Amino acid sequence: MNTIDNNNAAIAVNSVLSSTTDSTSSTTTSTSSISSSLLTDGRVDISKLLLEVQKLLREMVTTLQDYLQKQLAQSYDIQKAVFESQNKAIDEKKAGATAALIGGAISSVLGILGSFAAINSATKGASDVAQQAASTSAKSIGTVSEASTKALAKASEGIADAADDAAGAMQQTIATAAKAASRTSGITDDVATSAQKASQVAEEAADAAQELAQKAGLLSRFTAAAGRISGSTPFIVVTSLAEGTKTLPTTISESVKSNHDINEQRAKSVENLQASNLDTYKQDVRRAQDDISSRLRDMTTTARDLTDLINRMGQAARLAG
């Protein structure tokens, strides 16, 4: 059995402790107090010592692997929570966009219905006004026509009566003049009466002409009122609403299409962001795995170097013994 003195073993253990890293020094420091099972008559069993050191190294590597795996699992849980939060935000945005689209469609439909109701109301009001104006104009025209007809008939009757009276008076005057020249005073009275009747007929004709002129002026005023109605603001508003009704469906369809395009772009940008975050997470996981593999290789190399050092120390101790 290969053994060395206690002093040489203490020197070898101290050199091993000084050559290892901080993580291994704390572990191997506990081996400085060698159990009594490794001591044989004041000497140390090198083989058992090497086995204990290898066990400690394996435990150290296992502990480090467990720690790194826990760190990786914790990082994965964090990334998973982030992704779930992003997915929840995406779902909420999609739901909000859908609700906004539905609300916009409902508002558009209500606006269309309101516009049609306003147009119908304005059209009905305009038609009522036009009908009332037409009825008033027709009544006025009928009144004027009737008054003109009556006035003309009255004037004609008056003129005819006057002519008849004048003719009768003239006949009577001629007859009276022919029968008796002595009745000059009676003829003069008849002539005066005829002249008075003629003047009355002339006055009635003048009144009829004046009334006809008044009716003609009333007709011209109604014609001007109809022209003002056609050029008034309500009439222009109704015309504008009728023209706007033609372009309203096109405007609504363009608005809905624009909202749909905006929602699609927003969803696409969110999906691109999620894909970018997933790629970043995969790269982080790959770097962490590479780092773990590199550290494990370094630890394996360190353990191999330590084993070689201990073997050389054992060989040196055997040669010295």
UniProtKB/Swiss-Prot annotation:
GO terms for cellular component: cell surface; extracellular region; host cell membrane; membrane. Its main location: secreted. Keywords: Host membrane, Membrane, Secreted, Transmembrane, Transmembrane helix, Virulence. It is found in: Secreted; Cell surface; Host membrane. The chain crosses the membrane at residues 99-119. It is a single-pass membrane protein. The core secretion machinery of the T3SS is composed of approximately 20 different proteins, including cytoplasmic components, a base, an export apparatus and a needle. This subunit is involved in the formation of a pore, called the translocon, in host membrane. Belongs to the SctB/EspB family. Component of the type III secretion system (T3SS), also called injectisome, which is used to inject bacterial effector proteins into eukaryotic host cells. EspD and EspB are inserted into the host membrane where they form a pore and allow the translocation of effector proteins into the cytosol of target cells. Necessary for intimate attachment to epithelial cells. This is Type 3 secretion system translocon protein SctB. It comes from Escherichia coli O127:H6 (strain E2348/69 / EPEC). The gene is sctB.
